[in-house]
Amino acid sequence: DVYKRQVNNRSEGLNFRVYNNKDIEFLDVRDQSGMRTYVRSLCFVLFKAVTELFPEGKLFVEHPVSKGYFCNLRIGRPIELEDVKRIKQRMQEIIAENIPYHRIECHTAEAVRIFSERGMNDKVRLLETSGSLYTYYYTLGDTVDYYYGNLLPSTGYLKLFDIVKYYDGLLLRIPSRENPEVLEDVVKQEKMLDVFKEYLNWSYIMGLNNAGDFNLACEEGHATDLINVAEALQEKKIAQIADTIFHRGENGNRVKLVLIAGPSSSGKTTFSKRLSIQLLTNGLKPFPISLDNYFVD
């Protein structure tokens, strides 16, 4: 199924009207842009279902993990399996009703008023700090939300999904990009989940719960403080790694080799130098070797 179009190399929704000759490429979930459109539309269905079932609840789609998207649902009590079943059933009903997504363009001040009346303060801060005179928002029935990007024409386009209880939250499962007819397998990523939780905790401590909070902090001149805290936390983590390596040697399990892996330009060499400095403070003498300097001819 087609979920998005590239019109003259520009991403457009399926509702975009073409009046002149243009180069058009149709995209499905095997394309990254098409998958993002599918996920955004599915998240709106999830938001609508949660809003109807738990009017006082708060839903946060936080980060991709375990080949899906981890969601934090706050309803004043722990999430139970019955809650997840009700949410999934309501999502299936919304999809079966084939409700259209409507994109509405308006003055930013009007959009701020609409979201403010609904208590969606995160959207209010985001729009107030966007610097745009005009903006847009989406409606799905009587539910309103803001998404940075195109959505599908209607909920009937969403053929495949699942939502399951995952640790203390929910996992929104999506189709596989390699085989859109099946869902992605759930891959346990406990360490990745712990890293994301730590990041969210630090963001909460610093008062940065969303992009709007970050924009406001920058406007108020706190950008340097945010950078310094992030660098200090990174240095603290590297020091903890160096301490772990040192203490293993004290217990007779001397570490002789430390491997640092990552994609191109991800900071591997910089990380190795920072780790070397911390190892030196522990009385160890490291020898960093960058394998980028060695290639097979």
What are these regions (language model features)?
Residues S265:
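Walker A (P-loop) phosphate-binding loop of P-loop NTPases
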Residues V2-Y3:
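Short, small-residue-biased leader/transition segments that mark boundaries at the very start
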Residues V258-I260:
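Hydrophobic anchor at the beta1->P-loop junction of P-loop NTPases
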Residues N8, F16-T37, A49, K58-V65, ...:
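Auxiliary tRNA-acceptor-end handling modules of aminoacyl-tRNA synthetases
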